From Swiss-Prot:
Co-factor binding details: Binds 2 magnesium or manganese ions per subunit.
Biological process according to GO: protein modification process; SOS response; translation
Protein name: Probable alpha-L-glutamate ligase
Cofactor dependence: Mg(2+); Mn(2+)
Species, as recorded: Vibrio parahaemolyticus serotype O3:K6 (strain RIMD 2210633)
Residues annotated for Mn(2+) 2 binding in this entry: 260, 262
EC number: 6.3.2.-
Similarity comment: family membership: Belongs to the RimK family.
GO terms for cellular component: cytoplasm
Amino-acid positions noted as binding ATP in the UniProt annotation, renumbered to this chain: 141, 178-179, 187, 211-213
Upper classification of the organism: Bacteria, Pseudomonadati, Pseudomonadota, Gammaproteobacteria, Vibrionales
Entries under NCBIfam families matching the protein: PRK10446.1, rimK_fam
Length: 301
């Protein structure tokens, strides 16, 4: 099979592992810089050009779209879909997952466990929003933040008001969430491929930190999931319409709650923590499912 990986950096661990795993299976793998693709949007003859040449017809595309280029990246994926190419994650599913508020609303609609969350536009509503999520300590998040950036733990209501007012003064979109204290700075990353959790790791925040992201200095180890945690991760992926994703879960006193669904999860942490060939399992899925014109919109909203 001829397979394209959409990635801005061919030297990233995830990109290199995917290329290696694909080539070991006899596939031709091309790494394509998403931002260097440009589209010829013509009726009944969609085309993508790259560095002055028309791209060949691929059997499958693996999108590795960074958050900062979501708009352009999803347009490129959509163009591949119009050309009949199988895309591991569809453009609409990537767009859903990148909008944190939209994601939570869709998950909520399907009854999936979530931390209590508030969202408001006007400062007059701040105190009531804080009250509705249970008061401090609480977590304030920028909707556009990634890798733990733009996430603040407010330990008092007064501190929460000050942080929210500051963000609103900067015209930033934020949401306010209850702090799951019983999680003790740990979360679980479930790696879902084709409606199945293929690997999972527990990430622990470093001492004095509440964000468990590995980019923030957290550590990771293999974890055995409960049936409820496994079902929560798979259902969250289905709601988003993602064939491949990382679902981040906290263990709360009311059961597992979903914090985020990541449409472009990194492979390094999960492969090192679990010892599993995650890249190879992704190609297992592609080999079974990649057929021309087989993209079907999954999920709603």
């Amino acid at each position: 099979m001829r397979i394209a990986i959409l990635s801005r950096n061919e030297n990233l661990y995830s990109t290199m592992r995917l290329k290696q795993a694909g080539e070991e299976r006899g596939h031709q793998i091309d790494v394509i810089d998403t931002l260097h693709c440009y589209m010829d949007i013509t009726s009944n003859n969609p085309m993508i050009r790259y560095k002055g040449e028309e791209l060949p017809q691929y059997d499958a595309v693996i999108p590795r779209i960074g958050a900062s280029i979501t708009f352009y990246g999803t347009a490129v994926v959509r163009q591949f879909e119009m050309m009949g190419t199988f895309c591991v994650n569809e453009s609409v599913a990537i767009s859903r997952s990148r909008d944190k508020l939209r994601s939570l609303q869709l998950l909520s609609r399907k009854g999936i466990g979530l931390p209590r969350t508030g969202f408001a536009h006007h400062p007059d509503n701040i105190q009531d929003v804080i009250k509705n999520v249970g008061g401090a300590p609480l977590v304030i998040k920028l909707l556009e933040g990634t890798q733990g950036i733009g996430v603040v733990l407010a330990e008092t209501n007064k501190a929460a008001e000050s942080v929210i007012e500051a963000f609103m003064g900067l015209k930033a979109n934020i949401m306010v969430q209850e702090f799951i204290e019983e999680a003790k700075g740990a979360d679980i990353r479930c790696f879902v491929v084709g409606n199945k959790v293929i690997a999972a790791m527990k990430r622990q925040a470093k001492e004095g930190e509440f964000r468990s992201n590995l980019h923030r200095g957290g550590s990771a180890q293999l974890v055995r999931l409960s049936k409820e945690e496994r079902a929560t991760a798979v259902n969250a992926a289905k709601v988003m319409g993602l064939n491949l994703c990382g679902v981040d879960i906290l263990q709360s006193k009311n059961g597992p709650v979903v914090m985020e669904v990541n449409s472009s999860p990194g492979l390094e942490g999960i492969e090192l923590a679990t010892g599993k060939d995650v890249a190879g399992m992704i190609f297992d899925f592609i080999e079974k499912n990649a057929k021309p014109n087989s993209n079907r919109t999954r999920g709603k909203g």
